[in-house]
Amino acid sequence: MLDDNLAGRTISIFDEYLSYGPEAVEEVERMMNERGFSISLPKDDPHKAALVLFGEIFGAQISGTSYDSTMKLMIAVGVSLLVLMREKRESRAISFENIIMTKNDGTRLLPVIVNIDEPELHLHPYLQRALLAFCRSILNNKESFFLKLVQNLLGVDGLDGQLFVVTHSTDALVNDYRKIIRMYRDEKEMVRAACGSSFHFDSEIEKHLIMHFPEVKEALYSRCTILVEGETEYGSFGYFAKTLGVQFDYHGICLINARGESSISKIAELIRRFHIPAVCLYDRDVMGSRHHSSYVFYTDYICFEMDVVKSCLSHGKRKLLDDVIGD
């Protein structure tokens, strides 16, 4: 909900842009309709057109699909950003021209930093991702209509934008570890930052980590991680822990399926770079090819499944195995 001052400034911006002529009105109308709206703006009255546009974007939605409400939210956020940038242009606290960056080719860019705090408080996962992607598009000059608004209303060629998101949601995290900063406390309880852009891996490992990162990014919120090779370990470890009276969530333990022994060491190294302890479990058949190190363990027999079978047999639980096979 906009307060009266922000609403007035928003309408003023619409009014100014639509005053460029019928072509501008038609352009706005076309842009809105391409995004799922059904809107017709007066061509000969810019102020009335501005009021209609404002009501369409910021008014209560009585009917429509979830796509309609998503588009309304994203456009409303984009317009709000534009209002704030326009306020910076009109401010006398600092000359707007002193803020502008001019590239060697003469391109004029407005540096903008946008911070979004805890989007998960009000948005479900799909809206989190949609809104953040839309903001990135605006800041990277990929939204053609908003780019035109920036050019006409601010007198610059585009934006040089950065987006900072403070979140405890995996949905709001980008799927690229190089764009993540994790805050943590060191052994002296001092607050430190681990920045993914400062990590250096060779190109093949980097590609591998980026490909797997969407599956492991939950670990960034954990206190410790356990990495296992495959589906069997991943499916059973949680139940083993409960049998032992250990709740992973209570202790902040994240169980990760590395989907292959070759991925374990790579993912563990990435997690440790973010200053999160990582425990690794391998099948014994790869033990000879690996260096022994702390927090790396191997099954007693050639593979995890054999460990389970041997343990059941040694404890007289053959019937349990027969029942599993029967299922």
Describe each region flagged by the PLM.
Residues 1-118:
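Extended helical coiled-coil dimerization/tether regions that scaffold
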Residues 101-104, 152-153, 210-215:
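Pre-Walker A adenine-sensing motif
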